[in-house]
Swiss-Prot record:
Domain of life of the source: Eukaryota
Species of provenance: Felis catus
Signal peptide: 1-24
Region (Disordered): 60-80
Record's GO cellular component terms: extracellular space
Protein known as: Insulin
Keywords, ordered alphabetically: Carbohydrate metabolism, Cleavage on pair of basic residues, Disulfide bond, Glucose metabolism, Hormone, Secreted, Signal
Propeptide: 57-87
Record GO biological process: cellular response to oxygen-containing compound; glucose homeostasis; glucose metabolic process; positive regulation of protein secretion
Main localization, broad class: secreted
Free-text function comment from the UniProt entry: Insulin decreases blood glucose concentration. It increases cell permeability to monosaccharides, amino acids and fatty acids. It accelerates glycolysis, the pentose phosphate cycle, and glycogen synthesis in liver.
Amino acid sequence: MAPWTRLLPLLALLSLWIPAPTRAFVNQHLCGSHLVEALYLVCGERGFFYTPKARREAEDLQGKDAELGEAPGAGGLQPSALEAPLQKRGIVEQCCASVCSLYQLEHYCN
């Protein structure tokens, strides 16, 4: 009997023993420290974009002042311009309130 025919049953058993590849990261909710850890994992040495909440609020207030016409050359928009609901599209809304993928997380890398 040829030597390769003896190896055939062994190869068949080995192929059954090797686990099928699974997705290491499925789309999931990531909040708080889990979100930060996932960003470190995805971005590595590049780091990721982060704006502290206090800084964002200050920038939002400056933007609202400009919309109301308090900034020079703003054109004097009426307060009704602020009545439309603001749409949040940050990483927390994308990955904590909803699910996100590694590909979506990668958009926040530097």
